[in-house]
Amino acid sequence: MSATQSAEPVVVKETPRVRGLPLVGSLFGMARDPGAFFVHCYRTYGPVCRLRILGREYVLISGVEAANFMGTRAGKDCLRSKEFWQGLVNEFGASRMLTGEDGDSHKELRDIMRNGYSKESIKGRYNELVAITDGSLARDWPVGKAVPVVEAMQYMVVDQLGTILTGVAPLDYVKDIRTATLYILNVLVTRQRPRILLKRPQYRKARSRVMDLGRQMIRDAKARYATTRPEDRNLIDDIMAAHIETPAKMPASDLIVSLTGPYIAGLDTVANTTAAVVYCVLKHPEVKARVQKEVDELFAGGDLDEEGLLRKLPALNGAIMETMRLYPIAVAQLRAASKDFVFEGHRIREGEMLYVGTSVPHFMEEYWPGAGTFDIDRYQKPRAEHLQPGVYSPYGRGPHTCLGKSLAEVQMALSMARVFHKLDLELESPGYVLETKTAPTPGPSMRFKVRVKGYRHAAASS
């Protein structure tokens, strides 16, 4: 990895250009499978290349070189996020949001939300999370039916986050959040669809509903503020406290985008990942047997002991980590060059838009022997293949690494543990190969279904 400011005397290479079609450029490769497309670019052109999508030019930096660069001071100084997220900020009438800020402004927002997005925010509530999950399974996973897994997981995520954060799960808004997120990410963030799509009634209705949800969350959070002790605050309470106590940091204009953020962030990411875990575990009977044995032992004693939860679930945790390697949500990170710099011998100009392909090493045999094989033991010592520098980036890299990482790890582990403990599931056919989608984030297709054969353990008990 190397990066220097352009003022330094360096030998600059000519950056190769990715071959694409007239007008659309590399759109179809990106739309079909962005992860595979970025790997192809790395293998063909190296860690730096240029490509066009719908008339816009981007620089793609990828591989371990790019992943490691993101964590350096040079990466922090040379790249910023604002351009890609400003359209979303404007759409909500806000002044700023966490994902679109850098430097001190970004740190200020992370400090406000850090506790609420950490696993400490649900300490002492694991059994409550289990009960919420059981309710979701009883409601959305009927015995004898083929269940659309991504949709069922989306309802579970909103049920969990809503109940834990506000005491109320806004399940009536799931489809609106999903629709609004799809349009906003495709049109305003990744810019792979024309802006005129935002005039569609389907989007306008969904956006209006999400705004209504945000306004209701504001009213509820204001009502709780006077009666909630600082040590008892959750994420929503912390955001409202910042608004009331330091309005310059959290003005009223930013409340809706900040308060609905957990739903928008978690709906696709956690739901896509857990849906992919269901597929991977069911696809590999030997993994399924290990996971079931493990989770049955976890719940055999009744209420959970929260201490060292993930250490008690090496097979399930390995399955989740391996799923996140093969089906990453953060295929690439979107950035703009904040100054002229040279990366791996290639000049990148201030203001140029970049894709940072941090997931490319996930699929490289050099780092993961048998990279295409689902192997849940890669993460245990002495192998620990994920600890090689720059090879594993399921939550992104750099200053914008997912703030909710530790919370998501617990949420996904408990959700999957309960699913495989409670339900007897099967793929629609043994030979089924997962169909995937790329928008708004990569993951299993909404058409992916599993059949609920029955309950492994009685619905009314653990």
Where are these regions (language model features)?
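Cytochrome P450 proximal C-terminal region
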Residues: 2-5, 42, 133, 177-180, ...
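Conserved cytochrome P450 K-helix/beta-meander segment immediately N-terminal to the heme-binding cysteine loop
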Residues: 356-383
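Cytochrome P450 I-helix active-site segment
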Residues: 13-23, 126, 229-237, 280-329, ...
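Conserved cytochrome P450 catalytic core segment spanning the I/J/K helices
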Residues: 22, 26-29, 118, 207-274, ...
